[in-house]
């Protein structure tokens, strides 16, 4: 590429990182790392209503958990928070006022609301109409004096070129253009409290920080013409823009909503449930981008190497919780036991299950986990009464050979000494039951599995029986025999 790549992720300090925000950060990160560019983080904290105590630290922690690093941020650079840059914004506000490209507006909220109501009643598209329209210089001066005497604090509006055409070649969408007359009239660049509006401040920040490419969600497309107006007014070259498609719920086909209860949408949720960050990183990287081919499991280094902005999708990205869980399970299965056991310890400790057999239980159930917190329901069998059987399990236990199998296997367990009761000796006892009864296959194994574990599927049966213990295994079999004899 001909120019240095500098991209940014600019969140508000709300604390939570939504999956959509995480994707924005991640695509900027991949783009910068692939091209050997700079990835920076800037905090947009001028909207004090959205400010959350400790929100900035939480944002950065969640990004670090995902596996991202950055070159510049408020941690290492001064004035990387918008609240620290108010003097800079004021400098350019004053410049635009002096050049007649912006003006102070004294119209009140009540007057704006009344005008909007009138326009809507007349079937007109709501827009701001310059309050000074048709005034002579004397009338304008008198109007301003009257408003200031009434204590009305002005906003500052950018004077829009209504005949201008604002267009750009989008990295994702292709050519896009807006007419200046269709963006709602002269718009506010500085609020009454002296703070800049988003579309003004972001231009000053991106120019000052030499941002080369702005990669963000397509909900920002409507903001882009306003930002181009500011670039034009200040005589600056705009960066390249790329607007990623919406993320939709794969089940509803609609835009992902915080009300969708069938999905986990915040990075903090994945951290708390014990997903591996590598799995979440991998999944998010494929939301609206793919490297081609059939493979879906990639390391961070592979994703950096493969990332190609030309393969960003023009179609909405489907968020599929089941696919994420499949991917997460693959990562957990292939992770080393020590890593997963360390992640499982807090869950086990809270449940009072951090026993001498805890690590073996984690090893046993690791292949089944989608998230590490599942170690608790998966191991309920070992720490609670025998579970209620499902209809399908009850159906299996009505087989006429079931009592024969269970009585024979119970006798084998009762005959074993404590020293003999080890994992490698359990399977031969099952085979001995087969030899004695002539019953084999699922008619042999399924009744034993259901009687011992209360489940039709699970880890290797000898492992389950050993960890459950000889006495508890015998007790479970006796309980089932009583149940099926009724």
Swiss-Prot record:
The gene is gltX. One of its GO terms (cellular component) is cytosol. HAMAP family: Glu_tRNA_synth_type1. Its main location: cytoplasm. Its EC number is 6.1.1.17. Catalyzes the attachment of glutamate to tRNA(Glu) in a two-step reaction: glutamate is first activated by ATP to form Glu-AMP and then transferred to the acceptor end of tRNA(Glu). It catalyses: tRNA(Glu) + L-glutamate + ATP = L-glutamyl-tRNA(Glu) + AMP + diphosphate. It comes from Streptococcus pneumoniae (strain CGSP14). NCBIfam families: gltX_bact (TIGR00464). InterPro entries: aa-tRNA-synth_I_cd-bd (IPR045462), aa-tRNA-synth_I_codon-bd_sub2 (IPR020751), aa-tRNA-synth_I_CS (IPR001412), aa_tRNA-synth_I_cd-bd_sf (IPR008925), Glu-tRNA-ligase_bac/mito (IPR004527), Glu/Gln-tRNA-synth (IPR000924), Glu/Gln-tRNA-synth_Ib_cat-dom (IPR020058), GluQ/Sye (IPR049940). A motif ('HIGH' region) lies at residues 11-21. The keyword Electron transport does not apply. One of its GO terms (molecular function) is tRNA binding. Keywords: Aminoacyl-tRNA synthetase, ATP-binding, Cytoplasm, Ligase, Nucleotide-binding, Protein biosynthesis. GO terms for biological process: glutamyl-tRNA aminoacylation. Signal peptide: none annotated. This is Glutamate--tRNA ligase. The keyword Iron does not apply. It is found in: Cytoplasm.
């Amino acid at each position: 590429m001909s120019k240095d790549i500098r991209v940014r992720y600019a969140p508000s300090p709300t604390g939570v990182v939504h999956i959509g925000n995480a994707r924005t950060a991640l695509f900027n990160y991949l783009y910068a790392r692939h091209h050997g560019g700079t990835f920076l983080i800037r905090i947009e904290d001028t909207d004090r209503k959205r400010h959350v105590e400790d929100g900035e630290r939480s944002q950065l922690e969640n990004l670090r958990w995902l596996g991202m690093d950055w070159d510049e941020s408020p941690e290492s650079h001064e004035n990387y928070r918008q609240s620290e840059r108010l003097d800079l914004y004021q400098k350019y506000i004053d410049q635009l006022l002096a050049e007649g490209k912006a003006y102070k507006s004294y119209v009140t909220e009540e007057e704006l609301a009344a005008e909007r109501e009138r326009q809507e009643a007349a079937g007109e598209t709501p827009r701001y109409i310059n309050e000074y329209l048709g005034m002579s210089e004397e009338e304008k001066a008198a109007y301003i004096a009257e408003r200031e005497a009434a204590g009305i604090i002005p906003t500052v509006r950018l004077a829009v070129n209504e005949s201008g055409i604002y267009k750009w070649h989008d990295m994702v969408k292709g050519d896009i253009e807006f007419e200046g007359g269709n963006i709602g009239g002269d718009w506010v660049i500085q609020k009454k409290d002296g703070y800049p509006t988003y579309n003004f401040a972001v231009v000053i920040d991106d120019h000052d920080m030499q941002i080369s490419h702005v990669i963000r969600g397509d909900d920002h497309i409507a903001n882009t013409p306003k930002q181009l107006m500011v670039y034009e007014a200040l005589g600056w070259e705009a960066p390249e823009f790329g607007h990623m498609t919406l993320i939709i719920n794969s089940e509803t086909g609609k835009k992902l909503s915080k009300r969708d209860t069938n999905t986990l949408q915040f990075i903090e949720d994945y951290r708390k449930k014990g997903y591996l960050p590598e799995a979440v990183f991998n999944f998010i990287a494929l939301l609206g981008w793919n490297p081609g081919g059939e493979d879906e499991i990639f390391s961070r280094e592979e994703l950096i190497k493969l990332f190609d902005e030309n393969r960003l999708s023009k179609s909405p990205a489907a968020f599929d919780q089941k696919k994420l869980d499949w991917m997460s399970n693959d990562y957990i299965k292939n992770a080393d036991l020590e890593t997963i056991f360390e992640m499982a310890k807090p869950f086990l400790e809270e449940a009072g299950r951090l026993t001498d057999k805890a690590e073996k239980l984690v090893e046993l159930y690791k292949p089944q986990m989608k998230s590490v917190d599942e170690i608790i329901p998966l191991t309920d069998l070992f720490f609670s009464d025998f579970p209620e059987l499902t209809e399908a399990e009850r159906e299996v236990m009505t087989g006429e050979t079931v009592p024969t199998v269970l009585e024979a296997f119970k006798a084998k367990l009762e005959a074993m000494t404590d020293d003999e009761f080890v994992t490698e000796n359990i399977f031969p006892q099952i085979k001995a039951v087969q030899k004695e009864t002539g019953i084999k296959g699922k008619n042999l194994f399924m009744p034993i599995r259901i009687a011992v574990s209360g489940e039709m599927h699970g880890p290797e049966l000898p492992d389950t029986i050993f960890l459950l213990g000889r006495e508890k295994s015998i007790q479970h079999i006796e309980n089932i025999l009583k149940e099926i004899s009724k």
